[in-house]
């Protein structure tokens, strides 16, 4: 009876061996879960969004008259928050700004602080709303006229300012200015004399109308037909023989000898007069280009007094 082992004791002896096996399986499951979580976290870290690239610099058009204006505008722009760098181009009246800010807001601040016209050249703002209808110019009975003026302009800024003033005149459609030649071409329905007065009132610059050459009159078709008939295209004469040609030449020579060459003499006289006129015009032009020196200062050299001169002992006497 004492040798038999109870089944309850056997179960109690096998229980401690089963517990460690379950713990090992749990540990393995936890380790696998950690590996999977680590593998999932790695691509998330790699896929983190990169910072956006800085915006490209934008270009503004501003009226720059001189170096003082440019420095004043540059200082006012650098005070705006977000501006990193400012580059001024006085030849083209352009300002390049680098920074994170709205170009239109910068334009408005420049207009408010400096009282100068400014607009965005690049990048252009997106169009809002529906596109504007095309402008239809009214048909005037007088029609368009082109007037060429001669105005003294010192620099490109003067030319731009003059163009802006002329475009505000009623009836002006297009204006082209060239400061190198002082030429201004205006197209529109305005009066030329009123345009000259307007330019002087607005800019205090003297303008002069350049006269245009008259167009060459076209020969009518009837005159061309008469010339053809006179040349003998319609009525062709029979060919002349050699003897007849010689006789005609002799007759022409005798007539020219009797008349004394009137037509040729008149032609040579006109050429001589033209040559004299051109020579006189050239001489007058050379006189204008000559430099006349100022008259020299004349010094009158008075002879020395002869009162106490050794050369003339009779100049003085003591009585």
UniProtKB/Swiss-Prot annotation:
It comes from the Eukaryota. A metal cation 2 binds at residues 155, 158. Keywords: Coiled coil, Lipoprotein, Metal-binding, Methylation, Prenylation, Repeat. Residues 317-319 form a propeptide. Residues 1-11, 24-45, 224-254 have a biased composition (Basic and acidic residues). Residues 255-268 have a biased composition (Acidic residues). It holds the Pfam family HMA. A metal cation 1 binds at residues 66, 69. Residues 55-118, 144-208 form the HMA domain. GO terms for molecular function: metal ion binding. Residues 21-48 form a coiled coil. A lipid is attached at residue 316 (S-farnesyl cysteine). Residues 1-57, 207-282 are annotated as: Disordered. The keyword Lipoprotein applies. The modification Cysteine methyl ester is found at residue 316. Belongs to the HIPP family. Heavy-metal-binding protein. This is Heavy metal-associated isoprenylated plant protein 9. The lineage of its organism: Eukaryota, Viridiplantae, Streptophyta, Embryophyta, Tracheophyta. The gene is HIPP09.
